[in-house]
């Protein structure tokens, strides 16, 4: 996974100044193993026409959060930041783009007919944290281990969690990367798996990422894992059975709830090893310098219209830039075994819940701004790979269609997530006739 290089360096510099974190605390974003940014992308510099970024704590510069700003968050969520300064008229879409969008299905790639979406004004929104947002345990460092050991571990209280596994086999023998849960209490504990995304190990990393997302977004019956007192168990036998050959990727995402404190360990062991039996004797593997691991609270973000309701939408093109701190702040967390602060640049594993309630019909699409991008979206019960016919959106001159929204189904909520191996940021833009 790659956060476009120039965007990453610029963002790291600003975060250093803002937070005074030591340079050793900053771990670069997950790297795409294909070797960096794809040709034709604007990773060399930030868009010169980008509008200013609002302050998360004081969006209108009045030394406080107005009731109207905070009140824009729906019930069941809390205010995170406002993105309400969106100067300029909406960008008129080229006629060819409007025609292409009208004929396209969700997941189709369409040419933008010369339109530079970065010149469009933003859509005024408030950004909220859903009350049920999980804390994410993220394991991607060392990304390609060849030895046995603990990749990441944390002891967490009862609650809601997302477990994110992203590791390739750096050795010659078959290897697996299961999750092991330890109950250190005196009573049995339960883990309820609400969502699970898996794919067969492969060297086609982007394809693996999209397959995992589609599986994770699909409906499934909850599965309960019982962890007896003073016992270690596998979270999921299916993950334990994913045996990677050299350079193959194992990727998995789980959303779970737990009813008691548990120690969660992500481990690297040979394919034939009983992971639950050996975890207690495994040492912690050292993080590599290019990837991340850690525990990150609030891994879902809810994007809602800025108040007053219905006033933000204009005819033409408006956009939301995701993955560059304009809308979604970079997730902050900690590498629990070492205590080192972490920044999850690119916010991989974050679910964007977009609930705009647009009063007028519009078509939503995505433009890649930092490199080739792929992901998945769910509306209602329909889940779609983005893009559908190809692995990734490969240029800045095309867009992938997210679908129609607003008007009669203005209350529909989009669930959008970027795939492993993708580059960020992206522009989610809206075309209102």
Protein language model regions, located:
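Ser/Thr-rich, Pro/Gly/Ala-heavy low-complexity intrinsically disordered linkers and tails
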Residues: 25-78, 82
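C-terminal functional regions that serve as terminal interaction/effector modules
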Residues: 86-118, 357-433
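A eukaryote-biased signal for short, well-structured alpha-helical docking elements
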Residues: 96-154, 290-329
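Asparagine-centered strand-capping/turn motif at beta-strand->loop junctions
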Residues: 167-173, 180-193, 256-258, 358-362, ...
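Short acidic, flexible loop segments centered on an aromatic residue
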Residues: 169-171, 185-213, 364-377
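Short, solvent-exposed loop/turn segments enriched in Ser/Thr/Gly
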Residues: 170-178, 248-252, 348-354, 409-412
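Intrinsically disordered, low-complexity Pro/Gly/Ser/Thr-rich segments with frequent PxxP/GP/PP motifs
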Residues: 207-244, 383-411
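Terminal connector regions
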Residues: 242-280, 422-433
